Amino acid sequence: MAIRILRALAAARRATSAIEFAIVAPILVLLATGTVGLSEVIRAQTDLTTAAQTMAQVIATQTLVTTAQISDFCTGSLDEMVPYSTTGLKISVASVTRGATSGTVGLDWHNESCGSGAALTSATTLAASVVPSNGDSTIVVQATYTFHNPLSLVLPATFSLTETAFARPRANTTVTYN
């Protein structure tokens, strides 16, 4: 009797699909969740890149910038991060020039008023390859953003994103800061 039941179970194929689905479904849910979470991180990084490049380009079109103007430009860059929260966004701006006679790269000015705790890590080192000739100047913008992943089932709950953007002054001179 027991052998007959075992043979009947071995020959049965009707529940095979249900068992396969029960095994594969959790894996598919994890993959889908991870894909959505990763695409959100990539989109946040893309928005951060746009915010940094926009800030650099807008400042590079000026010949003179003030703290109030940089604050206004910062507000515009914050809008680039929509629909994400901007509480974790910090943007630092600097102007770097290669000396006309010495050839050494020096910091003209920097502003860290866009986001509390913003810090530009070694602007002169970052911009050294962008200002190859004596007298060349560039605007360096470094944006950092702490992205909070709403789908932290597969990926980490937070990501620290950083983007650096460079822009040459349009007037072919150094952008002064007042």
Label every model-predicted segment.
Residues 1-79:
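Alpha-helical assembly-interface signal, strongest on the long, hydrophobic N-terminal helix that forms
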